[in-house]
């Protein structure tokens, strides 16, 4: 599995939409550097979250609402989108997975106006042929494609 593009919005330390294009790198090694708190771990959390539905760091116990950025208001939907390639040469296939974590959203109308309510997360997987894979089976399919579980 080779990551091609990672897009994050309102996710972890990334408030505004941020895209990392791994294809711009023409080397076999990609180095992620930065100051403490700059968002390096969030990049790995986003990749693992896209593939497995939970953050990479089990020590941090990051899941759901905790993944929602504190740098945007509750009206901005947190999301991660990862485009990745599987295989090589003529057998290379490109997949795109998009996950929205469980998050809080501000109610804008009615009796609960101004309060937050929890929104259920979602996932979609676009196959190489452009068709969307059934969301109920996406986690299993991603493990099959990548060949690894989160623990491995």
Locate the predicted segments by residue.
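Extreme N-terminal "head/tail" segments of very large remodeling/mechanoenzyme assemblies
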Residues: 1-145, 150-151
């Amino acid at each position: 599995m080779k990551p091609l593009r990672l897009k994050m919005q309102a996710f972890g330390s990334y408030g505004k939409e941020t895209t990392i294009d791994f294809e711009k790198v023409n080397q076999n090694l990609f180095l992620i550097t930065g100051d403490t708190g700059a968002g390096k771990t969030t990049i790995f959390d986003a990749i693992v979250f896209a593939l497995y539905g939970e953050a990479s760091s089990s020590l941090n116990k990051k899941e759901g609402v905790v993944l929602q950025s504190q740098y945007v208001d509750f009206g901005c939907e947190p999301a991660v989108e990862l485009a990745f390639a599987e295989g090589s040469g003529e057998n290379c296939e490109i997949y795109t997975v998009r996950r929205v974590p469980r998050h809080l959203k501000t109610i804008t109308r009615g009796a609960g106006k101004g309060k937050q309510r929890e929104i259920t997360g979602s996932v979609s997987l676009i196959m190489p042929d452009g068709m969307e894979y059934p969301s109920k089976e996406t986690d299993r399919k991603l493990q099959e494609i990548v060949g690894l579980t989160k623990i491995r």
